[in-house]
UniProtKB/Swiss-Prot annotation:
The active site is at 194. This is Ribose-phosphate pyrophosphokinase. Signal peptide: none annotated. Mg(2+) 1 binds at residue 130. PROSITE patterns: PRPP_SYNTHASE. It comes from Rhodopirellula baltica (strain DSM 10527 / NCIMB 13988 / SH1). Keywords: ATP-binding, Cytoplasm, Kinase, Magnesium, Metal-binding, Nucleotide biosynthesis, Nucleotide-binding, Transferase. Its main location: cytoplasm. Involved in the biosynthesis of the central metabolite phospho-alpha-D-ribosyl-1-pyrophosphate (PRPP) via the transfer of pyrophosphoryl group from ATP to 1-hydroxyl of ribose-5-phosphate (Rib-5-P). Transmembrane segments: none annotated. Binds 2 Mg(2+) ions per subunit.
Amino acid sequence: MRELKIFSGRANHDLAEKLCRHLHLKPARITLGQFPDGENYCKLDEDVRGRDVFLVQPTCPPVNDNLIELLTMIDCCKRASAERITAVIPYFGYARQDRKDEGRVPITAKLVANLITRAGADRVLTMDLHAAQIQGFFDVPVDHLYAAPVINDHFVSRRFAGDEVVVVSPDEGSIKRALGHTKRLGGNLAIVDKRRTNALEVRQNTIIGGPVEGKVALMFDDMISTAGSICGAARLVHEAGAKEIHIACTHGVLCGPAIERLREAPIDSITVTDTIPVTGEKLLPNLVQLSVAPLLAEAIKRIHHDQSISELFRER
């Protein structure tokens, strides 16, 4: 069987090292950097001819830098005669630009999928895409994993399950995700009726379902970016009498005013995974980071051995 090689870009080296430890491997050696004019530089420091190569690189902020680095890594491995190249993209940037919601705008998620495919990726492994239909933008197989089992197990271990909890969907678009969590955690479902006045301004109105008074409210989303929506929803739930509020997401983008908003919001804990590094001021006292490395490592092992990974596709 062809040898397995795992290379890491600079976007999330810690995650790559964790999943390598789970596979009892060392990260393959690669030199990455920039020329004085800002152009990316990539050189493989070991042979990949005939190897099964996995490139770990989320396209998180700085999105364009990390995307270009991923593309150069793919091209580098292709030209070095790797037998198969799998792009492991724990967080897929540009996923929110998956359709034309107004005239004269691009579908950038499709463009990025084309770039990754044309660069030479034979397969993509990703997690919690903002829009599941992005899988269809690729002309190569896409394995789409979910972090919900990892997050649910965390809340069960904290005894946040059963009749004392209410799972709150922060908007209509998250109802399916919230329903999945209620099946695992129990409790009732509540929905924040969110009315968006424009692309930047969100106004929360009412809570449908519940009840939330006296309950431990759990709120889930695929990502927290500027945190405006989820913090607004948390305030509404707090005003409705929830005794505790805990929020969780797969991708902690946490950009712009997110940290300030999360500090000021009536939120008891924030749970994210390590698809994106969380460092510096983002390490709030009430922030918990879970690892998806075991899940990704198992998927990589099964792909390498040409085994089924369908049982890893659980949304809950």
